[in-house]
């Protein structure tokens, strides 16, 4: 009764040893022998042993950088066993290696549900896969479809929204199409100030400043930014944003005032460089050549990583 499973295990152990020695031919010989023995009369013990064989084969295929082969072995496992943590981990590795980001994302969600990772590690992995999933979109319509496949909690993550807007820009979408994605992010940032860390605020402001300059001047946005600036006077990035939008509205004096206050205090290099560059352009507009040269020099001195 126990002989076939024991013989199969012996071959699997020998195959594992051959794999460790990088002897693919010997590994294949022992594995093939195990598969032949597994074709006998079915039993619960035999099924479990063959599941182990499939999992081992999937792991070896991944080691050989053959993700498609690994997925074929995993697909041969019964559904109950396929949902076990080890099988899901192997499927996650295989789908990531095979650049099947949507399937990898679904698998990572299952692993998170099963508690296979810490909360922090699971969220980081899922965020990475969400962004890869969005990167697979090659036009705005595909991006909207990919976005709709995300879970609500994933769509609410500021870094995911920002990644989606940046992807839209890369796909050549007009700025008017990008603004509806940024507006809720802005509203949450100013209505729930604890929802965004300073580094995230800097990224949101940078993306907003770029996008707002590509749409017609909007008085409502100007008023909203000015209210936020007055509500959070210590958020220097809002002075920068106000200055950039005032410049877009041809409010030269106020733009200069805001940017001159913000530029020396900004900690984010890209924001600071843009502030100095815009001040240089304002000085050139007023034909203040010497002042413009000073600002251009300061912009050049900012090192952007």
Predicted regions and their residues:
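Flexible helix-coil transition and linker loops at the boundaries of alpha-helical arrays
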Residues: 2-5, 38-48, 115-120, 148-155, ...
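Structural register within alpha-helical repeat arrays
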Residues: 7, 14, 57, 91, ...
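Alpha-helical repeat scaffolds
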Residues: 26-37, 66-78, 101-114, 138-153, ...
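Alpha-helical adaptor scaffolds
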Residues: 46, 50-63, 194-268
